[in-house]
């Protein structure tokens, strides 16, 4: 997908369709059970201005995020009253504050030394934001960035793709296994289906979807 799609989406809408209004219930329910320690460095790829990041921060974690849109990160810092410094780090812009490191720019420009303290990944909206043609590259780059032993907590959705065009895109359990089974032991924490899982996607024509949390 072209960068302009995401830049325009953030500029045109105060509440983009993928932006959730509350913390993800799978995160609330399963984060501790997934094996997360009390204080970790957590990487949130394609983070936008997700409220999940604030919850992770308030839970004692240092949050490292990246999003293509500098607008999204500026809005997030303003909304959460984060007094961040802003500087260039190679091809990326970085916002820094106690407990926060937020990069603005292309995910594929990140380098391993920028994530060398990460022990856990929280992916709620990164993999499903990408079309199938980009997901293998995303997974490969993510694995190359992470220190050995890093755990991945991911939330994916599966739906009838004749009813709606992504993003967010449908990612099957089989595809997720194919992308991440090498080097990771994947455990399904919860998988639920039904119209009650739709949230704001009901307005786009979906009648049901399955949401799965894995670690």
Task: List PLM regions with ranges.
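Generic beta-sheet signal
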Residues: 40-42, 119
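A short SAM/SAH-binding and catalytic strip from SAM-dependent methyltransferases
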Residues: 107-111, 118-134
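Class I (Rossmann-like) S-adenosyl-L-methionine-dependent methyltransferase catalytic domain
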Residues: 1-39, 49-52, 65-100, 104-114, ...
């Amino acid at each position: 997908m072209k960068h302009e799609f995401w830049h325009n989406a953030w500029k045109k809408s105060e509440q983009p369709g993928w932006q959730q209004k509350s913390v993800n219930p799978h995160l609330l329910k399963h984060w501790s059970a997934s094996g997360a320690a009390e204080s970790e460095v957590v990487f949130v790829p394609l983070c936008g201005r997700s409220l999940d990041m604030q919850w992770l921060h308030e839970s004692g974690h240092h949050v490292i995020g990246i999003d293509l849109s500098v607008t999204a990160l500026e809005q997030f810092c303003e909304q959460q009253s984060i007094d961040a410094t802003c500087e260039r780090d190679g091809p990326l812009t970085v916002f820094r504050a106690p407990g926060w490191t937020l990069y603005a720019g292309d995910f594929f420009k990140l380098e391993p030394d920028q994530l060398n303290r990460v022990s856990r990944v929280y992916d709620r909206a990164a993999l499903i934001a990408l079309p199938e043609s980009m997901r293998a590259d995303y997974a490969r780059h993510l694995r190359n960035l992470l220190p050995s032993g890093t755990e991945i907590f991911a939330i994916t959705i599966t739906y009838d793709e004749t009813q709606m065009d992504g993003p967010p895109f449908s990612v099957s359990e089989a595809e997720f296994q194919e992308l991440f089974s090498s080097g990771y032991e994947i455990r399904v924490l919860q998988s639920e289906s039904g119209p009650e899982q739709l949230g704001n996607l009901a307005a786009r024509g979906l009648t049901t979807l399955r949401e799965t949390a894995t670690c």
